């Protein structure tokens, strides 16, 4: 019986390590896909399409000062099926928010300083560090929308 208990304990530890790694990798994958999506879909506007992001982005607004906000809101709507791997009842993608608290784990946050969009995620706890300075953070840098 003791052997079964030991094997069960080892199995639980291994399983927890596996699920933790899977969640971390899911956040990384979601983050990468969001960045690619923004770049590819805004390129449609640059090349003359009238809409992008499944019709959520009106390319005719490209010259407006708040274009980055239109883009971020369109991304949030078009990718609303992305779920936070750490809490699948919640959407993963938000325009706004931060990645510096443990509550931010698993979210993909878009910020729009200047004429750019910044995409950042906390892939595992602890998240509480200066933004984009921890190995637990994935940050895209700035995606230029012009």
Where are these regions (language model features)?
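N-terminal single-pass transmembrane signal-anchor helix
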Residues: 1-19
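Intrinsic disorder/low-complexity signature
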Residues: 13, 27-30, 36, 55, ...
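Compositionally biased, intrinsically disordered low-complexity regions enriched in proline and serine
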Residues: 16-19, 38, 87, 108
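Membrane-proximal N-terminal amphipathic helix
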Residues: 20-49
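Periplasmic/extracellular, small/polar-rich flexible segments of pilin-like filament-forming proteins
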Residues: 43-146
């Amino acid at each position: 019986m003791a052997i079964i208990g030991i094997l069960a304990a080892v199995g639980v530890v291994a399983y927890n390590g596996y699920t933790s790694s899977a969640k971390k990798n899911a956040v990384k994958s979601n983050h990468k896909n969001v960045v690619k999506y923004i770049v590819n879909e805004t390129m449609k506007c640059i090349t003359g399409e009238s809409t992008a992001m499944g019709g959520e982005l009106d390319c005719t607004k490209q010259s407006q000062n708040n274009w980055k906000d239109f883009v971020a809101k369109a991304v949030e709507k078009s990718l609303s099926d992305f779920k936070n791997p750490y809490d699948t009842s919640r959407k993963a993608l938000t325009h706004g928010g931060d990645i510096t608290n443990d509550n931010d784990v698993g979210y993909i946050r878009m910020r729009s300083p200047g004429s750019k969009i910044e995409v950042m995620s906390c892939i595992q706890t602890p998240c509480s560090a200066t933004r984009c300075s921890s190995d637990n953070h994935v940050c895209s840098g700035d995606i230029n929308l012009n």
